[in-house]
Amino acid sequence: MIRYKILLLSFLLSIISACSSVPKNTADGCSIFSEKYFWYKHSKKAEKKWGTPIYLQLAIIKMESDFDWLAKPQRQKIFKVIPYKRPSSSFGYSQAVKGTWKQYKEDTGNKFASRASYKDSVDFIGWYTNKTKSILKIPLTDAFRQYLAYHEGWGGYKNYKNNQKVILLAKKVENNSNKYKKQLEDCISSLSTKRYILF
């Protein structure tokens, strides 16, 4: 019985590890989805639901967390040595803050959504970018301006020109978005084929 429980625990831990581990090559969209096939299914569903291209979803997650499900902002330090509080409540793949995540759950009815879930994170990104399209009239294909709104918020977007650091980040997202788009063109047909695999 004890041995059975140990084997069961090991199996469950292996499942959790496989589901949550960071992909080996986060710079390649085909590699990501080859390793994490169900991520492709989740991203495809979010694209169909919200209209947000898969390559933009990946580019935002790449910038925000580099696909680390437990990512958090680094703690501030007092006198550059003593660890202090974190600058925001950002967490998970999308680095959504608590307030915006709460709004997402209320708007979508996805009340059990978790910021540590890839499925919920890409749905959140789809929801957010779709609202950005409605509020700020920014096309879902405009990765540069979509990320500016994602980072600065709908209210803070108008002041982005005063923040060169954010502009540079948005350019990186735009470049990554273009790279992911080109990469996925080479493997989208194989990804769209049904697969009956666990991960």
Predicted feature locations:
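Positively charged n-region of N-terminal signal peptides that target proteins for export
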Residues: 1-5
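Sec-dependent N-terminal signal peptides
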Residues: 6-14
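C-terminal motif of bacterial Sec signal peptides marking the signal peptidase cleavage site
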Residues: 17-18
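Catalytic glycan-binding domains that act on GlcNAc-containing polysaccharides
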Residues: 21-192, 198
